[in-house]
């Protein structure tokens, strides 16, 4: 789809009280990209934060060519100023986000305008719906942005046959059902005399709302469910039928499809026309009927309204922070407003679960003697990338015996946690020698460096900072990796049994004082050679650290939101092999049977995490490792027991993922315990026995159980906690964890890693 837009001129932007900075930033970016000047009128209650946000953006824009004064704020709160601007001949367009009064004033100005009014989003759960998915989606949506985002669900209309089952699932996932008396007390304290919601209630937590209303709720309550009458006349008169920008969700029992759709229509008629609605059903006829009846610009089918309406995650709608409500809501468009179109359009968007993948190197050779495969590759000139230790102990000379008459050049400057400068030096070496193959022999750092060297050699225009930008889906991101065929072959030969880098599309590098992770299948080696004899010289500590790294890969891939039957098979096998063979390899480095099993297990775990990816344990290990120089495998081992128990508990926030329709991490841990014959009559027992087995392994291979044990200074660590939490939060590994780690939870995990063993 191609959209063409021309500058309008001077745009007057009205900002709401509930989203003053995000709306200001979004409108500023759209205005700047379409070469429009923006004048903003913020809410009087949010003028300072909006003004500061726009000031920062204007300054940043000027550094790259934005004309001065393109983005301006007039914070004077008086209505006379607004009226003056509404009718000023120099204002070409008005873009309003706000309540009914702001929309009416905009429409009365007599200028071209876009109005985004209040939302009052209904969601209809049909008896054919996937109830577990519906509950997780609604909780994701209703708790998004402190519950103040206007497309979030406000009233849930539930088919009577599944009403009790759905409420039970809500309760299990952390919502609390209020009694009629509690609903009455809540209304008494949060509804103003004119029937509107008191400002003090907006964006409050469940506990704070309970305190305001004088009711009791459990400490972990995510959303309060308020039963509303089924009778449509009584429902229309209820004060909680309106938009509730707080974690309060009305629930209505519906006796029929007709009643359910009528109830949803009634919700939209209470200042929600044109905005957003959702329906959960497996019956396309039901979603079609819903779409034909409900007058909203966004109709989400089997997707959460808040995250889904914003576009780009659960569907292919245009990403936005400004939602058109069409003529129903006093606007000129129903689009997700960005830079285009003057039409009212109903966008019926179905949840999209994109196809998954399983991508591996073209050839993988394993077991003793696999280095002989180098003879079959017909290499004329090779650059061997390695580290000083591997070169000193003769591993490069060992390679030469299999390369025949090939010219061999050696780049041995790679250090642990390779820095960008080392990668650039390697690129210079590639330019000097112009080989037809790069052979990266060493640990994970060497192989990661080799991947990055080939990438920047073949595509010198790429920039590390852009390639490392965060993303949710590798197919929908800002940074573009090259798609052309490689000009040189990359051969990965691991000398440790742990990283799995030989089969992974990731490269972890150090840029400045932080770790960055490049992830793309263009980084995948062409050939992986797993020669177990190369691991025989690993010291005990390296054997333990790298083996625990592989175990973490397998366990995190097993519960990733991208896990699949393909990756599960590899993850399960890797866990089994590591639990069985790592203690043997640790105790007796000459035990080649155990060494071979561990070399293969590390690669098998690599095949799992290369396609399912990892989670919060790796994010924490990357952050702590970069800051305090703790080895990656050791840091993983310290955090792993805490992360296992964290992921097995009820999430405070679910990870949005179209293919991940129910929270199954606890079940999968129990399944792993059952498959390995650890016993247990219940899922909880099987889970706990798996966790105990992991603890036993960590003790057996002498992994320190706390950061204090490895010598991290307590005062320095405590001072670094905010920085570490931020680094972990920005780490790409975190985006495939089965639950969203909140900052406070990351801090808890970081403190637990310092304190030691879980209780």
Which residue ranges define each predicted feature?
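ALDH superfamily catalytic-core signature
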Residues: 25, 30-34, 103-234
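Glycine/threonine-rich beta-strand-loop-alpha-helix active-site module
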Residues: 53-54, 58, 421-533
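Gly/Pro-rich interdomain helix-loop hinge
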Residues: 627-719, 759
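Rossmann-like NAD(P) dinucleotide-binding subdomain of oxidoreductase/dehydrogenase enzymes
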Residues: 2-133
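Conserved C-terminal structural/oligomerization subdomain of aldehyde/semialdehyde dehydrogenase
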Residues: 215-355
């Amino acid at each position: 789809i191609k959209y063409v837009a021309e500058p309008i001129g001077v745009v007057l932007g009205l900002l709401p009280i509930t989203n003053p900075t995000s709306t200001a930033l979004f409108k500023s970016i759209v205005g700047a990209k379409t070469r429009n000047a923006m004048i903003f009128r913020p809410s009087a209650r949010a003028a300072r934060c909006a003004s500061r946000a726009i000031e920062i953006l204007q300054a940043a824009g000027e550094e790259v060519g934005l004309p001065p004064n393109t983005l301006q704020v007039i914070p004077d709160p008086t209505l006379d100023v607004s009226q003056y601007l509404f009718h000023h001949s120099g204002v070409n367009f008005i873009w309003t986000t706000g309540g009914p009064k702001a929309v009416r004033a905009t429409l009365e100005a007599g200028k071209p305008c876009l109005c985004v009014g209040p939302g009052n989003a209904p969601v209809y759960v049909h008896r054919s719906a996937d109830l577990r998915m519906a509950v997780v989606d609604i909780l994701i949506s209703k708790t998004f942005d402190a519950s103040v985002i206007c497309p979030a669900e406000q009233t849930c209309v539930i088919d009577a046959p599944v009403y009790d089952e759905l409420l039970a699932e809500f309760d299990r996932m952390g919502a609390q059902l209020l009694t009629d008396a509690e609903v009455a007390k809540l209304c008494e304290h949060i509804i103003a005399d004119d029937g509107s919601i008191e400002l003090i209630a907006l964006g409050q937590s469940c506990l704070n709302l309970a305190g305001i209303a004088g009711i009791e709720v459990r400490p972990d309550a995510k959303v309060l469910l308020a039963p509303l009458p089924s009778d449509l006349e009584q429902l229309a008169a209820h004060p909680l039928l309106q938009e509730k920008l707080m974690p309060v969700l009305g629930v209505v029992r519906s006796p029929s499809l007709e009643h359910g759709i009528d109830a949803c229509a009634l919700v939209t008629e209470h200042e929600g026309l044109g905005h957003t609605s959702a329906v959960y059903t497996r019956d396309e006829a039901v979603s079609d009927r819903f779409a034909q009846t409900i007058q909203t610009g966004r109709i989400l089918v089997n997707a959460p309204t808040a995250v889904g309406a914003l576009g780009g995650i659960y569907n292919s709608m245009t990403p936005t922070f400004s939602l058109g409500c069409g003529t129903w809501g006093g606007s000129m468009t129903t689009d997700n407003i960005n830079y285009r179109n003057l039409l009212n359009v109903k966008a019926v968007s179905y949840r999209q679960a994109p196809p998954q993948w399983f991508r591996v190197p073209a050839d993988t050779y394993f077991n003793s003697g696999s280095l002989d495969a180098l003879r079959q590759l017909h290499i004329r000139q090779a650059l061997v990338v390695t580290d000083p230790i591997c070169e000193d102990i003769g591993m490069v000379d060992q390679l030469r015996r299999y390369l025949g008459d090939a010219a061999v050049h050696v780049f041995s400057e790679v250090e642990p946690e390779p820095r960008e400068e080392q990668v650039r030096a390697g690129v210079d070496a590639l330019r000097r020698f112009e080989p037809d193959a790069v052979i990266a022999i060493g640990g994970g750092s060497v192989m990661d460096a080799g991947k990055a060297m080939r990438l920047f050699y073949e595509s010198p225009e790429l920039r590390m900072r852009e390639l490392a930008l965060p993303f949710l889906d590798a197919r929908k991101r800002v940074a573009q990796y090259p798609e052309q065929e490689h000009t040189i072959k990359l051969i990965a030969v691991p000398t440790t049994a742990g990283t799995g880098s030989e089969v992974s599309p990731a490269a972890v590098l150090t840029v400045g004082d932080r770790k960055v992770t490049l992830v793309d299948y263009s980084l995948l080696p062409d050939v992986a050679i797993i020669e177990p004899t190369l691991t025989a010289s690993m010291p005990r500590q390296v054997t333990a650290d790298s083996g625990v790294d592989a175990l973490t890969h397998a366990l995190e891939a097993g519960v990733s939101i991208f896990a699949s039957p393909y990756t599960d098979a590899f993850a399960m096998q890797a866990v089994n092999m590591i639990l069985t063979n790592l203690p043997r390899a640790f105790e007796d480095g000459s035990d080649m049977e155990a060494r071979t099993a561990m070399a293969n297990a590390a690669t098998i775990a690599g095949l799992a995490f290369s396609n399912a990816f990892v989670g919060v344990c790796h994010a924490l290990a990357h952050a702590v490792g970069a800051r305090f120089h703790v080895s990656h495998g050791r840091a993983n081992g310290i955090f792993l027991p805490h992360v296992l128990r964290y992921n097995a508990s009820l999430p405070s926030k679910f990870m949005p993922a179209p293919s991940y329709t129910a929270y199954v991490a606890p079940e999968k841990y129990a399944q792993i315990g059952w498959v390995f014959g650890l016993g247990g009559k219940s899922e909880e027992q099987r889970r706990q026995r798996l966790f105990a087995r992991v603890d036993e392994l960590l003790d057996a291979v002498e992994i320190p159980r706390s950061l204090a044990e490895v010598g991290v200074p307590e005062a320095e660590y405590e001072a670094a906690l905010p920085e570490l939490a931020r680094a972990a939060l920005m780490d790409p590994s975190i985006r495939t964890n089965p639950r969203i780690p909140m900052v406070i939870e990351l801090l808890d995990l970081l403190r637990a890693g310092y304190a030691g063993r879980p209780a």
